[in-house]
Design a protein with these regions (language model features):
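Conserved beta-strand-loop-beta-strand hairpin that lines the nucleotide-binding pocket
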Residues: 4-8, 14-72, 76-110, 136-141, ...
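Small/flexible residues
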Residues: 44, 160-161
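N-terminal assembly/transducer modules of large multi-domain enzymes
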Residues: 107-159, 165-174
């Protein structure tokens, strides 16, 4: 298990870039009243067939050709975190179309890792592949944040006293 959820997002995002994605959509939704956190990552990379997807989730196999040994723990670790924290994990992939990953979990679960530095995660993904269209959509108890690497701008949510002076995505899941 990664000690921050943003590292799970970074791992999946970097795998998407390695799979040839030209578009990467990341969504984080937190609803503390319903005690629910949802993370979605979708790409238009090479995708996987059902057998490969099953192998990756069951046997810790990697799709990266340069690996000498199969490891591929990224999806397995996020699935473990999601299920351990009372949530659901799902991956949908279509060859030559792309992959979508959804992980949900209880916000209040004692084992839920903190979000971590989501700003640094998005920056790293943009720096790793500046031509890829990377989009981040966050919602935390009704406050919304949107970033698009291709638009070159972001929309910052209305500030509350708690988030005043913090980073741009501060109100998007602590």
């Amino acid at each position: 298990m990664f000690d921050q959820l943003s590292l799970n997002i970074l791992d999946i995002g970097m795998t998407s870039l390695a799979a040839g994605a030209t578009a990467l959509r990341i969504t984080v939704i937190e609803n503390t009243k319903r005690d629910w956190l949802v993370i979605r990552v979708r790409d238009n990379g090479c995708g996987m067939d059902k057998k490969t997807l099953r192998d990756i989730l069951a046997k810790n196999t990697s799709t990266k050709a340069h690996r000498q040994k199969p490891i591929g723990l990224g999806l397995a670790l996020l699935r473990q975190t999601s299920e351990m924290c009372g949530g659901v994990f799902h991956v949908h992939s279509i060859p030559r179309k792309g992959t979508g990953v959804t992980a949900s979990m209880r916000v209040s679960h004692v084992d839920r890792p903190p979000m971590g530095d989501l700003n640094a995660t998005i920056f790293a993904l943009c720096a790793a592949s500046p031509t890829v269209d990377i989009e981040l959509n966050c919602e935390s108890d009704g406050e919304k944040f949107h970033f698009s690497s291709q638009e070159g701008k972001y929309h910052e949510p209305r500030r509350t006293q708690e988030t005043q002076g913090q980073g741009a995505a501060a109100s998007c899941v602590a």
